[in-house]
């Protein structure tokens, strides 16, 4: 798991956008939307992004005091390196790829979750172990968009699936079932349209 795959790729002539994305230390998906031409020109060398993305809280406000990024009067760049093995067509015309953040000197950003996971997997391998993971989804989702929820002060929101209770309670409406089915397909290696 030491390296990400950067094999050749074909986006197809109908692609108008490539969304690059990765998580920060809070698990928030952050990234950019690029034209296919810009993506092709920068994917192998790294795509510059401000290290500010590691200093944003869940409300998207800059927060100071973290060990990384080390802001001392300026915001530095980090490089996004796409993992081409994660490239999928998200919907017609839009491709999405997950990647990792690296410092411009070539060192992995230690607070990047994928880099951290990679270093842990590599450390386990040196001791003769193989890492395995599992995901348990425990969440309450709401029908309102993030903008609507903020405007309401995160109060009086409508739970997706109705008010049937906990995540284990299966008496939920079809919108919950449809959503969770899509999540399970995606986690199982599928993507929209499969």
Model segments located where?
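ATP/Mg2+-dependent ligation/transfer catalytic cores
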Residues: 1-194
């Amino acid at each position: 798991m030491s390296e990400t795959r950067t094999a050749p790729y074909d986006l197809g002539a109908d692609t108008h956008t490539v969304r690059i994305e990765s998580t920060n230390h809070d698990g928030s998906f952050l990234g950019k939307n690029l034209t296919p031409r810009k993506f092709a020109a920068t994917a192998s060398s790294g795509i510059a992004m401000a290290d500010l993305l590691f200093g944003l809280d869940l409300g998207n406000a800059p927060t100071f005091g973290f060990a990384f990024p080390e802001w001392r009067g300026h915001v530095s760049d980090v490089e996004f390196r796409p993992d081409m093995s994660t490239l999928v067509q998200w919907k017609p015309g839009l491709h999405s790829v997950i990647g990792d953040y690296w410092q411009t000197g070539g060192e992995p950003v230690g607070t990047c979750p994928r880099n951290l996971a990679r270093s842990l997997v590599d450390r386990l391998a040196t001791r003769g172990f193989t890492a395995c993971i599992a995901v348990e989804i425990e969440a309450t989702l709401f029908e309102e968009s993030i903008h609507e929820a903020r405007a309401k002060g995160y109060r009086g929101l409508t739970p997706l699936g109705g008010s049937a209770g906990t995540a284990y309670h299966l008496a939920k409406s079809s919108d919950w079932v449809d959503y969770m089915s899509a999540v399970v397909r995606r986690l199982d290696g599928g993507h929209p349209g499969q």
